[in-house]
Amino acid sequence: MQIIHHGAVNGVTGSCHQLDVNHHSKHISSYLIDCGLFQGAETAGQSSAEQLQITFDINNIKALIVTHCHIDHVGRIPYLLAAGFNQPIYATTATAALLPLVIEDALKVGVTRDTTLIQACINRLNKLLIAVDYGQWITLPINHGISSPSRLTSTTAGPNTLENPPGYTKAKLKFKPAGHILGSAYVEIDLSGPKASSTSNAKTRAKTSHRVVFSGDLGASYAPLLASPKSPYRADTLVIESTYGDKNHQGRKDRSKQLKNIIEKAVKDNGVVLIPAFSIGRTQELLYEFEHIIYRNKNNPIWQDIDIIVDSPMAANFTQKYRQFKMLWDNEAKRKLAQGRHPLDFNQLTTIDSHQDHLAVINYLDSVNKPAIIIAASGMCTGGRISNYLARFLSKPTTDVLFVGYQAKGTTGRDIQTYGPQGGYVYINELKIDIKATIHTISGYSAHADQHNLINFVKRMHHKPSHIRIVHGDEEAKQALAQEYRKLI
């Protein structure tokens, strides 16, 4: 077998990994894990069309397996379908419910407003989509054949070829909770071949099966709403993300205290707090945290009077899905529900739907001397409604911009993080905007596992992998994590 990476090799976007089984044989079977969009610096030198092209052969791909529905993991799916892909698309039950919404929004924002074309794509997606419960083994389609032996090779972005006699005849898939966003999963693919005879030695028998684990995006420990991921029992080959492979997050109490302090300072300044956030995952975690702070500060007029505005119709749709799948929430969130609390809804919350209302809110906040918290996409400030807020308020000293998620190189969010503290500027909507706002970053709200979590994911396996492929990270993060893994295996 071999693994080929079509994205998330030199950065954190464009996740797309191909597992080839029996690749030395004419009976090759391939499985695609994610098919995401490139963003930020990883699109440099490419036209929009080039960024979206499916440049690899899809003829032998037997299935697409989706780990979760963030755009950097699913954004190229419409182009995969346009290239002729017509095989099963496997996803968890919650991801299968979210995915059509994500793809529809991505097409509207980045491709076309033609509802006929969009609906045709969604119909085709729904026809191929297969929802799978967590923990359920699903048999994958596979061509039967005998492959010739091969030895381990490793390249930076090319195939990783693993020893593979006597040929695999069965492949099965299981999703396990990843704790990243609703429906997110890491993937276990179990490959097996003809059973060895009783006279075969243990080494020969071991080669008749191989388990490959793809981490997708792993959630951070003690993140709100969703339970932390538990390590698989075993992995022979592991492909793992490394977004924060060189960093550890703040503790939950520290990040909550920092969030509270930032908001209270902004209220005293009568300023606007802008929080760029993904519509799926980060927005819901922030609402959960704000409800907790408001509940703990019942007698504090600051928190009883503050306006918290979610300016994103997509976020509102996804929040409804979070409520629908509350059976996937962690025990803490379920206890709050049992107490009659509503972790994703409270009196101070307003949701903005139409574009007209969006513009009206910006004009209103710009004309009054009143504090407010704005949560809007996109999470890396590469577009979406947050851009209009930044264009209007980034140059005001009373504004606070709060980053709670990873900002990829080449994105507006990374530029604001980098140049904001220096009194620099950015271009938004083709306008040069001086940064006079105060810029904050709270690492503890990241939905990605930190270095400690990533180490434990491997350390807690009973059968540790003999091969690890580190992806989805900047070079520094990948190297730092690799150094830690060398101590384990």
Question: What residues fall within each predicted segment?
Answer:
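Short, compositionally biased "basic patch" segments
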Residues: 43-47, 224-237, 327-334, 407-434
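His/Asp/Glu-rich metal-coordinating catalytic cores
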Residues: 1-65, 70, 74, 79-285, ...
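Short, solvent-exposed amphipathic alpha-helical segments in soluble enzyme
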Residues: 19-22, 189-192, 229-232, 255, ...
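Conserved acidic residues
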Residues: 62, 236, 372, 399, ...
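Hard-cation-handling environments
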Residues: 260-412, 471
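A short acidic, amphipathic alpha-helical/loop segment
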Residues: 76-80, 226-227, 289, 385-392, ...
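Generic long, charged, amphipathic alpha-helical segments
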Residues: 426-457
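C-terminal structured "cap/appendage" subdomains that terminate the fold
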Residues: 457-485
